[in-house]
């Protein structure tokens, strides 16, 4: 089912309730919502009109918009049935990890302070 929920403050909770994130866009820049969905552990299905730079995990598929509806449906169903770990260690080990980000920021501030 598709539901338009309007402006929300509880997006993280909504992602946790989803099985799959689907973005069949005709045009996109870099969709932050697609990045958020991946970092929530969701498998993501994007149209081929979404730039590949949005891919941060191995749970992303790009599907041509001109593919048959049935092909899209089969890909979404397969992604929903895939119950592999949504925690995704590759995210935990990435530069987006909070501990690594904090270390990078601390090092940056130390570098700035050393110039004073």
Regions found by a protein language model. Give the residues of each.
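Aromatic "clamp/platform" in nucleotide-sugar-dependent glycosyltransferases that forms part
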Residues: 7, 26
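An anion/phosphate-binding loop that grips the pyrophosphate of nucleotide cofactors and donors
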Residues: 18
């Amino acid at each position: 089912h598709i539901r338009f929920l309007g402006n929300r403050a509880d997006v993280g909770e909504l992602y946790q309730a989803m099985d799959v994130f689907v973005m069949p866009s005709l045009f996109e820049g870099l969709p932050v919502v697609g990045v958020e969905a991946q970092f929530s552990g969701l498998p993501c299905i994007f149209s081929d009109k979404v730039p590949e730079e949005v891919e941060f995990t191995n749970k992303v598929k790009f599907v041509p918009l001109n593919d048959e509806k049935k092909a899209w449906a089969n890909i979404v169903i397969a992604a929903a049935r895939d119950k592999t770990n949504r925690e995704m260690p590759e995210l935990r080990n990435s530069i987006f990890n909070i501990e690594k980000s904090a270390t990078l920021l601390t090092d940056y501030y130390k570098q700035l302070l050393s110039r004073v």
